Amino acid sequence: MSAVPGVLAVAGDLVEDVVAHTSEPLRMGSDAAATITRQRGGSAANVAVFAAAVGAPTRFVGCVGPDAAGDGVVAELTAKGVDVRVQRRGSTGTIVVVVDDSGERTMLPDRAACALLGTVDDAWLAGVEILHLPLYGFDTGTTPDALRDMATRVRAAGGRVSIDISSTRLVDVHGPAWVDALVADLLPTWVSANADEVTALGLDGDDWLARHPFATVLARAGARATRVLRHGDPTVTVPVQPVEGARDTTGAGDAFAAGFLSATLRGEPVETAVVAGHALAARVICATGAELA
């Protein structure tokens, strides 16, 4: 595998998002009026698109079905400037996203082919300086083993690994010990998580940081400041600038990761990279769905 630096690779889910915006309360057993759109989705795919949009050389690695939906989402990623490497089997995954008036979203994922990734060719990892892995990819199927293998190979070639905790559901289903073991196995340079995920796992606690001294935790908190935490170092607090016109939080965490990692690839220090993450997230929450305003 080439050790040439410069590529941000993102591996994991590429799905079709079905986004339903409603200003009415959901009524069990009844209906609520909504505006519905379809678009590319998946945390890993979102990070790749956002990173490419700000000029980072970006590659996506994943699995979609040999179907029309798979053709469509691959074509969309390619059109956004992403170097797309996918295996084709099963059926393309779908996520139903319900967005309320406040912009908050509830997601109903069917990962389908996303869980079926197998071992990837060395050429797919050539030139990778940073490999970003949302934890969604470690949920089920053959994909977790493929992602672990990718992380091992990237680190062996001198690259670095980034992970995003992704969802408190994963913590609820698998337990904090599962996440702890995964972090110990992947040896990420950065662990990004929102406030609920930080609380569920105790990522800001001395015990957790001491167990994983190799990792810098990026503890996001929505409109509140992001904390940068690392064992033995003082906490760095980076304020979030106010955002007017927020519509939809879908993809905000993905945009933060893309902005942060793209700035890191450019050689920016961690505080500057966090500011870049905030700025890209602000553009996403002012748009509908996981898109940039």
Regions found by a protein language model. Give the residues of each.
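Hydrophobic residues at beta-strand termini and immediately following loops
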Residues: 61, 108, 238-239
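Ribokinase/PfkB-type carbohydrate-kinase core domain
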Residues: 1-14, 76-87, 99-235
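Glycine-rich phosphate/adenosyl-contacting loop at the front of the ribokinase-like
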Residues: 1-63, 68-72, 246
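A general structural signal for well-ordered alpha-helical segments in protein cores
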Residues: 44-48, 70, 147, 163, ...
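Conserved phosphate-binding/catalytic region of the ribokinase-like
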Residues: 1-9, 32, 153, 203-293
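Short, conserved phosphate/pyrophosphate- and ester-handling motifs at nucleotide-, phospho-/glycolipid
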Residues: 51, 194, 253
